[in-house]
Amino acid sequence: MAQKLWEKNVQVDHEVDEFTVGKDRELDLYLAKYDVLGSMAHITMLESIGLLAKDELDVLLKELRSIYALADKGEFIIEEGIEDVHSQVELMLTRQLGDLGKKIHSGRSRNDQVLLDLKLFTRNRIQSLVELVKGLFDVLISQSNRYKEVLLPGYTHLQIAMPSSFGLWFGAYAESLVDDLRLLQAAYKICNRNPLGSAAGYGSSFPLNRQMTTDLLGFDSLDYNVVYAQMGRGKMERTVAFAMAGIAGTLSKLAFDACMFNSQNFGFIKLPDQFTTGSSIMPHKKNPDVFELTRAKSNKIQGLPQQITLICNNLPSGYFRDLQLIKEVFIPAFDELEDCLRMVTHMMREVKVNEHILDDDRYALMFSVEEVNRRVLAGIPFRDAYKQVGLEIEAGKFIPDKNVHHTHEGSIGNLCNDQITSMMQDVIKSFSFGRMNEAEKKLIQG
């Protein structure tokens, strides 16, 4: 078994080793690229303060770029007996460069390394989420504009209520995604601050230049207080998880609507046959499994903030191994949410709308408010008009006028999709992805 970075003259018990390492070797593969990027920035800073010579820096950077290329191609592995990605990278450097590889850890702890890795990983995955949310948003706005004239029943308490439209339905979920990205942007601001240099949570006696690594990695700012930088472990993940839960909540609700509207009892929308699954016993079945799985996966993601909260709950300041378990629920959640966004976008692009829903007389009563409003406009007090129409309904004499005349902002006749699109564009511009991408590219390419 390879010696741990921290082992001295006593080898750790095998069962203790297996238990404490847990799933780190598997999950740290997600962090490999970012661990290398962090090391590039750190050693560049070490050279600037005299802890590495220029020729040593050049040799280390060249080797780290080779390791980065392996990770980028998915060929990086964490060997048996190696605890984590940090240990594996240092081991690879030491094998290739001897004692020079042992110098990269000066002024650094695995505590601030993993903080940094998680932040670099998370901000890149946030960028992917933003792109996928924008893709779904574009489809929803397009469908809203395409079907803006097609009416469907609106419901309260699952009872037929008032006229709605597919323009409103698609557009509502588009605007919901705008607010979801606003929350994600707030989480991104917390994520995009540099913890490197906080070491084990109490700083270092080396004259580290933390602003330099902040600039090299394209962070917006620092986690200044070194104790708080360590306290941010769990807090950052929980904040991002709340934002992910917001997106998941939108997807879950949309998936429920789609399942319900696709059922034979509603028949508002239809999925292409190739987008449905069948039954082993009922030959007529065409099941909306994609939406059902999206609903379940999204509901699972909505529980993510609570999972992280319970792992961190009642921990004092400082580092504790409890925090390791956050990775097990946090890292895979990005894959699940991204999969849901891709599939819902794919489904919503191809959904077929029933343009003759209101030919069915069962929906006649949803025009009752329209009739009340017409009488109010003719001069009858609202409460009297309400009573007149109510009595006509009870007597079976109500005859609906199925023409609707809604003109105010955000209504059937004035969807404000251009304004909603403008809001989405403004939110996306508020992310500092350009600086992040440029900084990482510069480190990789030299």
Name each model-derived stretch.
Residues 42, 63, 67-70, 92, ...:
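Generic, well-ordered alpha-helical scaffold segments in large soluble proteins
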Residues 2-38, 99-100, 267, 282-446:
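Glycine-rich cofactor/substrate-binding loops
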Residues 119, 123-130, 134, 141, ...:
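Short amphipathic alpha-helical segments with heptad-repeat character
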Residues 141, 145-148, 189-192, 259, ...:
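Alpha-helical coiled-coil oligomerization motifs
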Residues 60-61, 217, 273-275, 362, ...:
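A general structural motif at alpha-helix termini
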Residues 217-305:
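Acidic, glycine-rich loop-and-beta core segments that form the ion-binding/anion-interacting portion
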Residues 1-203, 208-214, 221, 277-278, ...:
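A helix-coil-helix interface module used to build multimeric assemblies
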Residues 105, 110-113, 157-164, 168, ...:
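Alpha-helix capping and helix-loop boundary segments enriched in small/acidic/polar residues
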